[in-house]
Amino acid sequence: MGRFIFLSSGWLVVFLSLSGTGADEGCLPGWSLYEGHCYKFFFIFKTWENAEKFCQEQSNGKNLASIEWLGKANFVAELVSQALTKTKYHVWIGLRREDEKQQCSSFWTDGSSVSYENVIRYTKCVGLNKNTGHRTWIALHCGDNYPFVCMSRLPH
C-alpha cells in the first residue's frame, strides 16, 4: 500500500508539473507563449531575408519577431539567453528599415507599427545585441548570418 501511495503521488506531481501552468497552451511544441503570440528561437544561421522566409515557411502567420514594447523585449531577451548560455551571437528580429535616413520608414515584418525603438545605430536590418544580453537592438548588415527568433499569432 505504501508503494502504491508513493507512485500515485509521484504521478500527481508529474501531472501537475506538465499541466499546472498551461503557459504555452495553443502554441506548437517547442514554442513559447507571451501576450497572445508564440515565439521560438532558431539556432540556425541565416541572412535576415532568409530568416524571414524560414519563419514564414513554418506555418501561416509567422514572421521574425516583432518587439513593440519593453515587456516583450524582456521576454524575447530571456528566451534567447536561455538558448545561448555559452555562446554569444547577435540574433535577427523582424525590424527592417527601407530608407536608412528616415526613422519613420521602419516596419515590422508582421505589419505592426514601430512604436518602441531601441536601436543603437541605423541600417536596414536590426538584430538583438549580443553585448547587452540581447536587451538592446543593433543595426546589422542584412547579408550577415545570425540565428533568429520567429513569432506567430495564436490561432483564433
Curated annotation (Swiss-Prot):
Entries under InterPro entries matching the protein: C-type_lectin-like, C-type_lectin-like/link_sf, CTDL_fold, Snaclec
UniProt key word RNA-binding: no
Stored Gene3D superfamilies: Mannose-Binding Protein A, subunit A
Tissue: Expressed by the venom gland.
Keywords linked to the UniProt accession: Disulfide bond, Hemostasis impairing toxin, Platelet aggregation inhibiting toxin, Secreted, Signal, Toxin
Subcellular location: Secreted
Domain C-type lectin: 34-151
Pfam families cross-referenced by the UniProt entry: Lectin_C
Lineage: superkingdom: Eukaryota
PROSITE patterns noted in UniProt: C_TYPE_LECTIN_2
N-terminal signal peptide: 1-23
Main location as per UniProt: secreted
Disulfide bridge partners, by residue number: 27-38, 55-150, 125-142
GO cellular component, one term: extracellular region
GO molecular function per UniProt: toxin activity
Role noted for this protein: Antagonist of the alpha-2 subunit of the integrin alpha-2/beta-1 (ITGA2/ITGB1) on human platelets and endothelial cells. This protein inhibits collagen-stimulated activation of human platelets in a dose-dependent manner. In addition, it antagonizes the binding of monoclonal antibodies against the alpha-2 subunit of integrin alpha-2/beta-1 to platelets and it coimmunoprecipitates with this integrin.
Known partners and oligomeric status: Heterodimer; disulfide-linked.
Family: Belongs to the snaclec family.
Misc. remarks from the entry: Negative results: does not block the glycoprotein VI (GP6) and does not inhibit platelet activation induced by ADP-, and thrombin.
Name under which the protein is recorded: Snaclec rhinocetin subunit alpha
